[in-house]
């Protein structure tokens, strides 16, 4: 890949910046840590409240540069889908005072595992989140951390797709007293079976759900029947069970 010059990066900012909406779209440019470090030093990004960095090559070093950037201290939305952030980067995000206004965080298809999930769950900084996408190695234990968090209580949307979550993780979500505001739950590409689905179907936690996606989970006929018969899922408007 050709190394990007400062002129290249300035052009990307100019092309991706919507000053009126406070948005900066830098998705799909194969940006690496050094690239975003240079971008974050630019005065052009002052006033940005929504930053889209999906489909790049940003790792923990780039995250640290983002958190040190004075121009991004008013972010309300951060999309890091499909990058290379690990638990270490998530821990930095979780303890940062830069992101106190953040309401939307997308970190699916990164390298986040149990320690990252724990850091998110214990973060006062992220207590204003209403939308969280995280992955992709949480497993049942990571799901349990999210479920029991006393700070992630405002979530309307939670995406835990492709996280190796099984019945134990699904049951933990079902037992959560902190996720009752959820209207959208994405559990695609996991390993949840009928037992996990039955636990969810019996749970009052999910009475506000309007969208539930369970594509590529081995729930079987018993799991499908549990959903169909559940009074707690009566508000569903979208249900995806494709195997």
Residue ranges and their predicted role:
Residues 1-12, 21-24, 141, 168, ...:
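C-terminal capping region of solenoid repeat domains
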Residues 2-68, 75-77, 81-84:
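LRR N-terminal entry segment and analogous cap-like coil->beta motifs
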Residues 3-9, 30-37, 57-64, 84-91, ...:
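Short, solvent-exposed loop/turn at the beta-strand->alpha-helix junction
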Residues 10-15, 148-149, 175-176, 188:
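A broad, low-specificity signal for short, low-complexity segments enriched in glycine/proline
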Residues 16-23, 43-50, 70-77, 97-104, ...:
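Leucine-rich repeat
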Residues 24-31, 51-57, 78-84, 95, ...:
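Concave beta-strand-loop units of leucine-rich repeat
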Residues 38-44, 65-71, 89-98, 116-125, ...:
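C-terminal per-repeat helix/turn "cap" of leucine-rich repeat
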